[in-house]
Amino acid sequence: MRKLSIFIILFFCLLTVGAQQVSLQDVANRTYRAEGIRGIKPMLDGEHYTQMSTDGKKIMQYSFKTGKETGTIFDVNTARDCSIKSFDDYIMSPDEKLILIQTDTKPIYRRSFTANYYIFNVKNNKMEPLSENGPQQVPLFSPDGNQIAFVRDNNIYLVKLLFGNSESQVT
């Protein structure tokens, strides 16, 4: 009886394996690639996420529960002192009070690039450049959100946000 049940299970397994042929063309066309969601960034409250608009002019807030838009975090048309027409990406500070807006992205090699970054204050809707001395790479907020480190010309710089955005070279 046991041998018969194992034989039946193997028989059905072999039938299902032969049901679909996988071709090299299917693999090359990524037919069996897993779908994913790109470009969403969860917010601290755990109930909302942000996503950049397709035209690169707004950062929209959406509800996880409903999937519907609940507000606009940033808009190039309404931000004060905003001289850009669109942006490429953004980075939220740990407390979500500031946003680094990435513009004028220029690729260097594979995944590395330089860009001009702007600091957007969500509370007062004001925008100002991170640095006026040239494009930056890999900016990063400090854990408390009071400083931003970035790289320019293979040197590390630090911008202290509490002290008038003073920029100092670390290396």
Feature locations, PLM:
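Bacterial Sec-dependent N-terminal signal peptides
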Residues: 1-23
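Beta-propeller folds
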Residues: 19-171
